[in-house]
Amino acid sequence: MVSVSEIRKAQRAEGPATILAIGTANPANCVEQSTYPDFYFKITNSEHKTELKEKFQRMCDKSMIKRRYMYLTEEILKENPNVCEYMAPSLDARQDMVVVEVPRLGKEAAVKAIKEWGQPKSKITHLIVCTTSGVDMPGADYQLTKLLGLRPYVKRYMMYQQGCFAGGTVLRLAKDLAENNKGARVLVVCSEVTAVTFRGPSDTHLDSLVGQALFGDGAAALIVGSDPVPEIEKPIFEMVWTAQTIAPDSEGAIDGHLREAGLTFHLLKDVPGIVSKNITKALVEAFEPLGISDYNSIFWIAHPGGPAILDQVEQKLALKPEKMNATREVLSEYGNMSSACVLFILDEMRKKSTQNGLKTTGEGLEWGVLFGFGPGLTIETVVLRSVAI
């Protein structure tokens, strides 16, 4: 008779969870940051608020963002005036948009990831879907299963309303699933659409205005599995260790609330300070077992919450400016796409590493870190190992 421990051992994979493919997608509507303040104040009927517009222009200029992609076009916004008004009841209109657009954009990214992976989609055993954009039942995971034509018995996990740290959360969950289910192939999809957070400006709530200057739409998809099939599956990064922690004394630093007016975000001014204050402890916990204490010797994938966070982290750890190149490039080209951002940065890094003729997918280095920051203030840490190119 077979023992439970033997059954458990047979169910586990041999090697670490590995990212086997990455795909990304954005809406067709591209918004140039330099002209966005004019568009934003015009479409929200706020052109008379000249001082506020000047403040918003400065926010956009300092954002280090060149362009963003948005589902919301001028035409859609004109048809939905309540979405443009500050705190006007508009949840129904917003929900009607995102319950369709989140799975649609997610599908676009997933199709690219599945194509790169090179295996039939029938081999996908698990599906993780994450979005901060709206809620529905059955969820975006169900809709995506239908849109992609996945098997009806694929094991689904739906994460709603997590926020910007969740790119790390999906990797942590995918790692556990891949390593504890032999032969598992996990499709991970983060799809974010700002239709839930867009609203007109307010003189009294400048933190809301910060979000209007930073957030963009995007979806990213990964295939994760252990023990890659030789000659068929091509590993990109290995996931070695993960952690999640709530930063001490950070309650209310970042929070979001789904209300009649949509999803409202609140940020304390000291969010960059809280992140930089807690990052050393997270790094020590992650890299001390590997004997690594020089954080310039690893590659970096950090959620680009905004330029101030990146600047303070660089300063705190005395990082060389090039360490955040991939992160800053994604921020510049796409803005803050919440949970999808770090997955875009993984894609950017492996592509640039190949283009530049480097030895590994991690800018020529072996070890790296992925950080997610978001509501709580919650910090997700993932230790990555690159793969030889």
Swiss-Prot record:
Can the keyword Acyltransferase be found in this entry's annotation?
Answer: yes
Q: Which reaction does it catalyse?
A: (E)-4-coumaroyl-CoA + 3 malonyl-CoA + 3 H(+) = 2',4,4',6'-tetrahydroxychalcone + 3 CO2 + 4 CoA
Q: Which UniProt keywords apply?
A: Acyltransferase, Flavonoid biosynthesis, Transferase
Which GO biological-process labels does this protein carry? chalcone biosynthetic process; flavonoid biosynthetic process; polyketide biosynthetic process
Any one Gene Ontology MF annotation carried by this entry is:
naringenin-chalcone synthase activity
Enzyme Commission code: 2.3.1.74
Question: Gene3D superfamilies given for it?
Answer: 3.40.47.10
Which Pfam families does this chain map to?
Chal_sti_synt_C, Chal_sti_synt_N
* Record-linked PROSITE patterns: CHALCONE_SYNTH
| Binding sites annotated in the UniProt record for CoA | K55, F56, Q57, R58, M59, C60, D61, K62, A308
What is the active site of this protein? C164 (acyl-thioester intermediate)
Tell me the function of this protein: The primary product of this enzyme is 4,2',4',6'-tetrahydroxychalcone (also termed naringenin-chalcone or chalcone) which can under specific conditions spontaneously isomerize into naringenin.
Subunit structure of this chain's protein? Homodimer.
The record's comment on protein family reads: Belongs to the thiolase-like superfamily. Chalcone/stilbene synthases family.
What's the protein here called? Chalcone synthase 2
* Organism (species): Medicago sativa (Alfalfa)
